[in-house]
A protein has these predicted regions:
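Substrate-binding/catalytic cleft of secreted carbohydrate-active enzymes
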Residues: 361-365, 373-601, 619-627
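Substrate-binding clefts and catalytic carboxylate motifs of secreted carbohydrate-active enzymes
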Residues: 39-59, 78, 118, 178-185, ...
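Active-site-adjacent substrate/metal-binding segments within catalytic domains
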Residues: 75-115, 119-127, 132-135, 166, ...
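Extended acidic/polar, glycine-enriched regions
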Residues: 150-154, 231-323, 832
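Beta-strand-rich structural segments
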Residues: 230-233, 299-300, 638-642, 747-764, ...
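Accessory beta-strand-rich segments of carbohydrate-active enzymes
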Residues: 26, 30-35, 54, 91-207, ...
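Non-catalytic, glycine-rich low-complexity segments
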Residues: 25-52, 67-103, 114-116, 158-239, ...
């Protein structure tokens, strides 16, 4: 473990602080707030009225919406069961309305509303006036409300999203024939942005090629210096003014490494793109293992020195070059192959409506297994996920919306797709994480004309080195391949030997594209043998066919490819929903709740044991993991995943052997360690039988399997298994990844319940139902109607999604098995805290808490003291029952003998 991180943890524990007391920071409408009196981002998510149907006249300011449901955004219109594939979700119009009274302090300010994403086509009204009609689901909508607001009285914003199938805008494909799901609603954040009438523009609000907002790029980079170019687009909606543009670049420690001032005169109702440049000496460069981010402060002043606009952006100083057969060069140096996964944004039950912390945790979970590249599938990702990639050192392939569909009949479809290309580059051009621009729809037969325009528009929007577009190398795209910088393929393409290669999707292995049977697609609850097969398939898949060796794209194939192949992304990181198939995609290394399968540990074996000290929340530590449960149905072979040099396996106190985690015949840095034919269920039974009989015994010492991770001849870590015993209790874990939940009315925290034996081993083979309840400053999402609560254990786990309130404080979660009885497993409780939101919340009403289950005390007026005594008595009864059961076990042994 990194000494600095270890010391920090010790200090936090000594001073009684929570390890998770870290409130994550996210960008708002493309910037980070510095002085709210000048430019402010107000959280506009809380208190929207909603109805899941079309309603005539709902745009009117005086429309009666009093019987509508009140929701907080992000909102996906509905909560869905865990399996929501095959068209389960609602498609059609819906309505959102927000009532608010603008603060008098906003008079004279520009007031913008910024929707990060509304699913489908949408219309937006302010006080009954239509201000925007939008076609597209994944790009922000930035609307000026200034001329429509009424101060001192109630205003109403009305939004009508419609996620119905529509061929006229991308993706264009009907959901019932689509390999992902649209879901719906205002599913990303909404911000109210206020600033003066002299301001830096938003790049999507102005139609300027390679302009709008702030544009940063780098040139002449060496370890000694780098040239930084900054374009700032300033609008003046007041009188003509003499202005000063101030730039200040600060490193992570807050040290100012460069500053610059430029004077400019802007006429009334005009704008100017101010071009500035400076040199940074001895720059700290951005890379996956050292993702140094600088803060670029932008301040606009008048000639008297009054601040008219101010904010900051995060930038990472880096250059990339793709040199075909030579591979990827980062900051002028050859960089190893990149390995990662694709990412759809949907989450169990809530669809696309993830709060920022869940997006961040998605990226963090993937980074913690060593991944350093993500392909956006198949649309631009939420800003919070993009922020996370910048911060965690993860490259990203940015993609426009599209999947196996081209509308030949309506020219507007291509026009809108080309607009998506421009908007994508304008939005994400400053991010150090951007590796490739996927400016074509995924797996689609597009015309050559489109290829020409899409690549041309990308170059116009990013006219500097480091811009790389990508398309498939398949033969039916051969006419278009020459226009792109990079090709998607398994390895070097014969017809384009000088082009760099990236593998966009690897691992999936279906029999046909109707049935979708595959060794790669494994629901976690199917158990250990299918999970082991999935992991080993992702490591290597080959077979003999007609006397020839066949190989499928795998980890082995990727690492064994030529240097032309500089990176690859697994299909897919998480299980996700689909429109055209009744089954979800089950090929993730984590399930839809982001809980790991065995293949998760295959990837984690590639995580280094040191060298990631600069990556937040990621500890490069030795680990070893036994992918075996020692059940009566477990396989004979024992597979162990590790990032150590060697693994020593001990069973029942006897050493089985020591094996290396490297293989001279494999190009993969770490291979699965397989101990062949070492587990026999009868041995496990006999060992477990002989050692049992003590009250409160956690496990039978003689029945333990232990793997020890060895580095440089020393044991540095270990992992033990034993046959899971009688299910005794539930155990809860707050899966917050060290990111403290925010009390913003939107944040969601995952709490996992495990059914365990006395020693804490998870009883994977169990089908109990678990009921969750929540007290304090949180609310349980879902209930009986959407199969969320109570919830059946899947592979020994049940998951609660807890939404925070708008008040910071304590949240208490309780889990109990649905059935009652003296021998029922004990309940579990856990508490966590939320912290205040980063931004001001603006709302006039809150959703009502939905409580489907209210525990009834034995006595209606039962006091807290009586309740405590009743619980203690119940625990004593259980302990007595434990003694009785042990005696019964001894009697049965005697009788059988």
């Amino acid at each position: 473990m990194d000494f600095r991180k270890h010391l920090l943890k010790i200090l936090l524990l000594l001073f009684g602080l929570q390890l998770s007391a870290y409130a994550q920071e996210f960008s708002t409408a493309g910037f980070y707030q510095t002085d709210p009196k000048v430019r402010e981002a107000i959280n506009f998510n809380v208190g929207w009225r909603f109805i899941k149907q079309d309603v005539e006249g709902a745009e009117a300011i005086d429309f009666d919406d009093s019987n509508w449901k009140v929701v907080n955004l992000p909102d996906g219109m509905e909560l869905l069961p865990l399996n929501a594939s095959g068209g389960v979700n609602y498609q059609g119009p819906s309505w959102y309305r927000k009532h608010f009274t603008p603060n008098e302090q906003l008079k004279g300010k520009k007031v913008m509303i910024h929707f990060e994403g509304i699913m489908g086509k949408s219309k937006i009204w302010i006080n009954g006036q239509l201000v925007r009609e939008n076609f597209g689901s994944y790009y922000p909508i930035h609307v000026d409300l200034s001329d429509y607001l009424k101060f001192g009285e109630e205003n109403v914003i009305a939004v009508r999203p419609d996620n119905s199938n529509d061929h006229s805008y991308p993706p264009g494909k009907p959901q019932e024939t689509l390999d992902f799901t649209y879901f719906g609603g205002i599913y990303r954040d909404v911000w109210l942005i206020t600033h003066n009438d002299v301001y830096v523009t938003h790049p999507l609000a102005v139609d300027k090629v390679a302009g709008g907002g702030v544009f940063v790029h780098f040139d002449d980079l060496t370890e000694e210096s780098v040239k930084v170019f900054v374009d700032v687009d300033i609008a003046n909606e007041g009188k003509a003014k003499d202005l000063q543009v101030h730039l200040s670049l600060k490193d992570k420690a807050g040290n100012e490494v460069a500053k610059l001032k430029e004077k400019v005169n802007i006429s009334s109702d005009d704008s100017e793109q101010v071009k500035m440049s400076f040199t940074v000496k001895n720059p700290k460069l951005w890379s996956p293992n050292h993702p140094h981010l600088h803060q670029l402060y932008v301040t606009i002043k008048d000639k008297k020195g009054n601040v008219l606009d101010t904010f900051r952006n995060r930038v990472g100083i880096r250059t990339i070059e793709l040199k075909g057969p030579e591979g990827l060069f980062l900051n002028g140096k050859k960089y190893p192959k990149l390995l990662g996964a694709n990412r759809h944004q949907d989450f169990a039950h809530i669809g696309h409506a993830l709060p920022n912390n869940l997006h961040y945790r998605d990226a963090l979970k993937l980074r913690q297994v060593g991944m350093n590249v993500i392909r956006s599938a198949h649309y631009i990702q939420d800003p919070a996920f993009m922020d996370a990639c910048d911060e965690l050192g993860m490259f990203l392939v940015a993609a426009i919306p599209g999947w196996q569909y081209w509308n030949k009949k309506e020219p507007i479809f291509q026009e809108r797709m080309l607009k998506d290309v421009r908007n994508m580059v304008r939005l994400e051009r400053n991010r150090p994480s951007i590796l490739l621009w996927e400016v074509v729809p995924n797996e689609t037969h597009f015309p050559e004309e489109y290829a020409i325009k899409a690549t041309q528009f990308t170059k116009e929007e990013y006219p500097y080195p480091g811009k790389y577009t990508v398309t498939d190398a398949r033969t039916h795209r051969s006419k278009a391949q020459k226009y792109f910088d990079v090709l998607y393929a398994n390895d070097q393409v014969e017809a384009h030997k000088q082009k760099s290669i990236f593998k966009r999707e690897w691992g999936d292995f279906v029999d046909n594209w109707v049935d979708h049977n595959s060794v790669s697609r494994v629901a976690k609850q199917w158990g250990e043998a299918p999970q082991v097969k999935q992991a080993m398939h992702y490591f290597k898949e080959e077979w003999m066919e007609d006397g020839e060796l066949q190989e499928w794209p795998s980890m082995t194939m990727i690492y064994g490819a030529s240097e032309s192949l500089f990176g690859a992304t697994l299909w897919h990181s998480f299980d996700h929903q689909r429109g055209y198939h009744p089954d979800p995609f089950w090929g993730g290394i984590m399930d839809a709740y982001r809980q790991p399968k065995f293949s998760y540990y295959l990837f984690k074996s590639l995580l280094p044991t040191s060298g990631l000290e600069d990556v937040p929340h990621v500890d490069a530590e030795p680990f070893v993991y036994i992918a075996h449960l020692m059940t009566p149905f477990s396989p004979k072979d024992v597979v162990v995943f590790t990032n150590c040099d060697e693994v020593k396996l001990t069973m029942y106190g006897e050493e089985i052997g020591i094996k290396k985690s490297t293989d001279p015949n494999s190009p993969v840095p770490r291979v699965p360690v397989v101990f062949t034919d070492v587990f026999k269920k009868i041995d496990a039974r006999n060992k477990n039988k002989k050692g049992y009989g003590k009250i409160d015994q956690k496990w039978v010492e003689g029945a333990v399997m232990k793997a020890e991770g060895i580095i440089d001849g020393e044991v540095v870590t270990e992992h033990s298994r034993w046959p899971a015993g009688r299910k005794r209790r539930l155990l809860l874990k707050v899966d917050d990844m060290g990111i403290t939940p925010q009390a913003d009315g939107s944040d969601i925290t995952t709490v996992v319940a495990y059914l365990v034996d006395a020693g804490g081993a998870i009883k994977r083979l169990s089908d109990e139902y678990v009921r969750f309840t929540v007290e304090g400053e949180g609310e349980l999402i879902g209930g009986v109607n959407n199969e969320i609560n109570p919830q059946k254990l899947l592979w020994g786990e049940a998951v609660a999604l807890v939404k925070s309130s708008t008040n910071p404080g304590k949240v208490k979660v309780r889990a109990e098995v649905l059935k009652d009885g003296i021998n029922a497993p004990s309940f579990a409780e856990i508490e966590f805290n939320t912290v205040g939101p980063k931004h001001q919340l603006h709302y006039t009403e809150l959703p009502q808490k939905e409580q489907e289950y209210i525990p009834t005390p034995l006595l209606v007026n039962e006091s807290e003291e009586m309740k405590k005594l009743r619980v203690e008595l119940q625990e004593v009864k259980k302990q007595l029952q434990e003694y009785k059961l042990n005696e019964v076990g001894k009697q049965q042994d005697t009788f059988i003998e």
